[in-house]
């Protein structure tokens, strides 16, 4: 063979002359990376029996460089302590590159099958091997791919090695976290037991005192937190009653604002029965879609009026509380009545009878309703 190499010709060679070794191959560290994805061989098949002699991948090198070899990679997996063989994988390298860069074309080597295109030069190519940061190429061939060959997609050796290392690091981190959490739990348990024993003895540690002070401070801050609704710069009809006198926002009780007794008006949302009263009020959507609406101009504004009618159960306790608030501004308050009763006790029985407010002065609002329901008509012009 000349130093410049000769062109490959398969014309006079028998297809049975395919040199190989009976060895299962050898482990080689830092194997150069192939330009191409590997081929996974069907279990039980023989690569050298199925591989065409011109089975060179397309896409790299010129006509003279279409020569090289397929290198075997044996694989296995440990299952319950037993080694389980996996299908072989074969990687392609150009002549003069890869793990057998010093080998000559057709040398008999362990796990090596030589291939070349007709007319290729049987001398080392200068194509080198793939860099670790470059992605492997998909396998493409001129001829038909044997059925025993499975062409892998982006399963290069470095990716496989990277995934294996990543899984190993992940397992190590997981085990480390597990041990750390276990140790932390043990430490916490011991600490809690010691603190509990000290507490029984009436001894408080600095940490417990700090926690107690911190909780007290939090409770103090929560008590002073301002929950007053922000009603400034809002229209009257957009304001929200807070704790305290509602006349600041809605004015004194009158024929156009006739809901609420003196206690409710003075205390707003903090009044005793406010939550129950609020439950008897229609929802926004009910008012919006279930009311009769009218509008008219009022200077530089538009006055909107709506009439809404709905029913409350007559015998429900909340209904009675609600009805007592209608036009309550025109009736004596409970506070005023109680004050009068106290004054009357210091006076004569005759004077007391004259000053006690007769029950007939308290309007009865239930006589206008039927036996089962309360019908209400609200008219809002604000």
From Swiss-Prot:
Localization terms from the record: Virion; Host endoplasmic reticulum-Golgi intermediate compartment; Host Golgi apparatus
Compositional bias segments (type: Basic and acidic residues): 215-235
Compositionally biased spans, kind Low complexity: 154-163
One annotated GO molecular function: RNA binding
Region annotation (Dimerization) ranges: 231-334
Annotated segments matching region Disordered: 1-24, 150-190, 202-240, 328-362
Biased composition range(s): Basic residues: 164-176
Domain CoV N NTD per the UniProt entry, residue ranges: 31-153
Post-translational modification, as annotated: ADP-ribosylated. The ADP-ribosylation is retained in the virion during infection.
Biological role stated in the UniProt entry: Packages the positive strand viral genome RNA into a helical ribonucleocapsid (RNP) and plays a fundamental role during virion assembly through its interactions with the viral genome and membrane protein M. Plays an important role in enhancing the efficiency of subgenomic viral RNA transcription as well as viral replication.
Protein name, per record: Nucleoprotein
Organism: Porcine respiratory coronavirus (strain RM4)
């Amino acid at each position: 063979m000349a130093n410049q190499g000769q062109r490959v010709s398969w014309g006079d060679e028998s297809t049975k002359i395919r040199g190989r070794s009976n060895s299962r191959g050898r482990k080689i560290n830092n194997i150069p990376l192939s330009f191409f994805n590997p081929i996974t061989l069907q279990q039980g098949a023989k690569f050298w029996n199925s591989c065409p002699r011109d089975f060179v991948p397309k896409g790299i090198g010129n006509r003279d460089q279409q020569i090289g070899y397929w290198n075997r990679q044996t694989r296995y997996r440990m299952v319950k302590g037993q080694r389980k063989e996996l299908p072989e994988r074969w990687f392609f390298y150009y002549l003069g590159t890869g793990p057998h860069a010093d080998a000559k074309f057709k040398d008999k080597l362990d796990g090596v099958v030589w291939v070349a295109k007709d007319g290729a030069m049987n001398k080392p190519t200068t194509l080198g091997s793939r860099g670790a940061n470059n992605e492997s190429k998909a396998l493409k061939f001129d001829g038909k791919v044997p059925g025993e060959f499975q062409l892998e997609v982006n399963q290069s050796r470095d990716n496989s090695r990277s995934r294996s290392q990543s899984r190993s690091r992940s397992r190590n981190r997981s085990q480390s976290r597990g041990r750390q959490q276990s140790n932390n739990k043990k430490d916490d348990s011991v600490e809690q037991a010691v603190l509990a024993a000290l507490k029984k003895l009436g001894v408080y540690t600095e940490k417990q005192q700090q926690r107690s002070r911190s909780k007290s401070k939090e409770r103090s801050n929560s008590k002073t937190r301002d929950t007053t609704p922000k009603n400034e710069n809002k229209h009257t009809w957009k304001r929200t009653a807070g704790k305290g006198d509602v006349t600041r926002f809605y004015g004194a009780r009158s024929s156009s604002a006739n809901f609420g007794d003196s206690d409710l008006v003075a205390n707003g949302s903090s009044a005793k029965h406010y939550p129950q009263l609020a439950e008897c009020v229609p929802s926004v959507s009910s008012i919006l879609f279930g009311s009769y609406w009218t509008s008219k101009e009022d200077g530089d504004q538009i006055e909107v009026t709506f009439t809404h009618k709905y029913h409350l159960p007559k015998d429900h306790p909340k209904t009675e509380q609600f009805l007592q608030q209608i036009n309550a501004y025109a009736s004596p308050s409970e506070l005023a009545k109680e004050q009068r009763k106290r004054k009357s006790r210091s006076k004569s029985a005759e004077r007391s009878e004259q000053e006690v407010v007769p029950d007939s002065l308290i309007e009865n609002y239930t006589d206008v309703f039927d036996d089962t329901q309360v019908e209400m008509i609200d008219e809002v012009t604000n």
